[in-house]
């Protein structure tokens, strides 16, 4: 796979049945796993050879990832979960973040502990967290699996608006229910 900081194809959908490797694929792209044959290239650099510090830099400024399992901290609030990422990058203002909470219908959950929120609400918080950093690509691993159609549309609009602002590519994985976007390439595993 070849990724670039100036993507010519900017919107991918990776579709497959459950258990067929979508999350594994994402783990390869973001450098969490290296047990693969072939190459993952970013701007012609083979990421298989990256050091830990190179991966940290890559994840901080080039690749954002919305995990299927979300990886939020249940004992802290929604805003605190988002701010952990935002403090690393200093990329978004609190006003922008609060606007996203409002647009996604969870403005009343800003100070709620994640562990007391529904999975769909947590999914929206995780998307906000994924957007508070600079990126050349964002990987959204089954991002709307627990959302109604309206919230899925809003989340897709927010993600695409931010990706366009940053001139970034988007890779969405799905088992069937996916954001209704104008995908430029669909890959079926």
Model-derived regions, located:
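Helix-to-loop junction immediately C-terminal to a conserved catalytic motif
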Residues: 30
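Conserved ABC transporter NBD signature motif
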Residues: 38-48
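ABC ATPase NBD coupling module
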Residues: 47-64
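Conserved ABC ATPase "signature" region
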Residues: 94-109
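Conserved ABC ATPase signature
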Residues: 113-123
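Hydrophobic anchor residue at the start of the ABC signature
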Residues: 127
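Catalytic Walker B motif of ABC-type/P-loop ATPase nucleotide-binding domains
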Residues: 138-141
């Amino acid at each position: 796979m070849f990724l670039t900081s100036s993507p010519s194809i900017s919107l991918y959908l990776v579709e497959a049945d459950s258990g067929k490797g979508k999350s594994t694929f994402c783990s390869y792209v973001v450098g969490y796993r290296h047990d693969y044959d072939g190459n993952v290239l970013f701007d012609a650099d083979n990421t298989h050879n990256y050091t830990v510090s190179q991966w940290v830099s890559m994840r901080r400024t080039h690749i954002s990832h919305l995990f299927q399992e979300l990886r939020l901290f249940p004992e802290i609030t929604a805003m605190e979960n988002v701010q952990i990422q935002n403090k690393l990058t200093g990329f978004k203002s609190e006003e922008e973040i609060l606007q996203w909470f409002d647009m996604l219908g969870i403005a009343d959950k800003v100070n709620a502990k994640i562990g007391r929120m529904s999975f769909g609400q947590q999914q929206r918080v995780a998307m906000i967290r994924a957007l508070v950093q600079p990126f050349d690509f964002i990987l959204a691993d089954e991002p709307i699996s627990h959302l109604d159609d309206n919230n899925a549309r809003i989340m897709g609009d927010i993600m695409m608006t931010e990706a366009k602002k940053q001139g970034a590519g988007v890779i969405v994985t799905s088992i069937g229910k996916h954001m209704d976007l104008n995908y430029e390439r669909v890959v079926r595993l």
